[in-house]
Amino acid sequence: MTFLKYLLILCTIFLMVTNSLSEEIDKEFNIKPEGNLDTVELVLENYKCIFSFAATGGTNENWKIFLTTENGVATCFIGRPKPISYLFFKQFSAQLINTKTGKSNIIPEISDNSGIMPLGDQYILTSDNKVVQSNNFAGNLAFLVLNSDK
């Protein structure tokens, strides 16, 4: 009986620690095709995800920014949940910053409505680890995922 009590206590502590290692926050925002530069950002623990954009064409679209941290690694997702986006992005930039260190070391994954776009094709990673459109950018975005390295 005593062994079962200790086992139950250990399991409870394990669950509490495991749940505290992963956190998430999200925010819905509306992109208006007015061509004006706008910015949305989220902050969670030691991370800040920033998405700046200017879009034209189509109609207003609801997009979502989602930031999660787990075991010291952060992931930021920015995109339109459904359906595909009909906006034409004149420009965009995205960055995931560790606010504690001031560093931004990310692994980006960006998709247009046709699929994943290779780094260097339609977007580039600047020297300060900000994702921006390249000269070849066709104006279409479906989602962006920024993963921090540990």
Curated annotation (Swiss-Prot):
Q: Which UniProt keywords apply?
A: Secreted, Signal
The domain of life for this entry's organism is Eukaryota
- Where in the sequence is the signal peptide annotated? 1-22
Tell me which GO cellular component terms the UniProt record holds.
extracellular space
Where in or outside the cell is it found?
Secreted
Pfam families the UniProt entry points to: UPF0556 (PF10572)
Matching InterPro entries, A to Z?
MYDGF
- Give the PANTHER family listed for this entry: MYELOID-DERIVED GROWTH FACTOR (PTHR31230:SF1), MYELOID-DERIVED GROWTH FACTOR MYDGF (PTHR31230)
UniProt lists the family membership as follows: Belongs to the MYDGF family.
Name of the protein this chain belongs to: Myeloid-derived growth factor homolog
- Species annotation: Dictyostelium discoideum
